[in-house]
């Protein structure tokens, strides 16, 4: 049984040019596991705390030297000599050492980087692919599936400098037979969308997650452009390819109103639920994330009652990968799916617990990146190892996004005939 002999933290950069935390976990047999913590732009108020320095003279206050010092000091001292394969014990020890509800003392970014690095070191020590080790930790050994990618090809909201209010417009290749076929379909649509936008005289620069970020007349206009690109790529919208939205509604919710400034419209909760319902009737939208504000549980209930039987309603800012909040949502019949982001909760163990709780309640779990990413591709292994069935990791450009897709291609190749891709069966309705 290998032991942890050293842990090193360092400050590295994410895809937005902001500092983030990387950790190495070194074992007594020479194995090293490394992992980076991602960072979000539109964040839920109840997320675990990302510890930043606040020193305006360095990186405009966004440095992470405090988190790095916590890795190189108290976390290292705590975990030296421990078994890297005992993930639960490592994570619980760090959570206990932190002692706060939201990991404010050590920083969720510090704890998460070490948690994931330990898992990677353990997988190498056990001579297992990371996804197989994660499946074992999840209590589902050998139960894998390739996720349907939700590819964010038009960016708005906090992820782009344009007038589009909804944050993400995604395509899902639900009619593909394999993950690699689905990825190819999405890529072809992405390139056709560029041509569609160019033909309209629109900007084809990309946003934080690699999707195009033009100014458009309305959210419906964005959906129309994607529909045209799907058709030009030779696919049938609604059969081969479906659509998904991430409204990130908390970003345009104020004083009980949902304000679509790009369209000059304002709604109460019921009105905005009706607006979204209307979009699902005009386009084959089968998934909507954060359709209402994270605090508007009454509004969420209205939306769930209106379209929850047919549409996947994903809680991101709503549930923040937190089992306490998810449990309450399940009991109240709020939404029917959870977005899974490691750094919202801050450890691999707690992430797996959220996925398990969701699945036990009949909720789906969508594995997700953050808008501030690195080359770390752990979420690809998480999606396969938990058989989550869906992954959100951005568009088809920018290496911080494509690194996850490329890892999924490698895993599909490794799994061979066991690389199950369920397509439309992963969704409601």
From Swiss-Prot:
- Write down the EC number: 4.2.1.11
Please give the name of this protein.
Enolase
Tell me the route in metabolism or biology where this protein functions: Carbohydrate degradation; glycolysis; pyruvate from D-glyceraldehyde 3-phosphate: step 4/5
Catalyzes what?
(2R)-2-phosphoglycerate = phosphoenolpyruvate + H2O
Q: Which superkingdom is the protein from?
A: Bacteria
Which PANTHER family does the annotation name? Answer: ENOLASE
Q: Which residues bind Mg(2+)?
A: 246, 289, 316
Q: How does it assemble?
A: Component of the RNA degradosome, a multiprotein complex involved in RNA processing and mRNA degradation.
- Cofactor: binding comment: Binds a second Mg(2+) ion via substrate during catalysis.
Q: Which GO terms describe its cellular component?
A: cell surface; extracellular region; phosphopyruvate hydratase complex
Q: What does this protein do?
A: Catalyzes the reversible conversion of 2-phosphoglycerate (2-PG) into phosphoenolpyruvate (PEP). It is essential for the degradation of carbohydrates via glycolysis.
Q: Which GO terms describe its molecular function?
A: magnesium ion binding; phosphopyruvate hydratase activity
List the catalytic residues: 209, 341
- Top-level class of the enzyme under EC nomenclature: lyase
Q: Which Gene3D superfamilies match?
A: Enolase-like C-terminal domain, Enolase-like, N-terminal domain
Binding positions for (2R)-2-phosphoglycerate? 167, 341, 370-371, 392
Q: Which PROSITE patterns match?
A: ENOLASE (PS00164)
Per its Swiss-Prot or TrEMBL entry, what cofactor is needed?
Mg(2+)
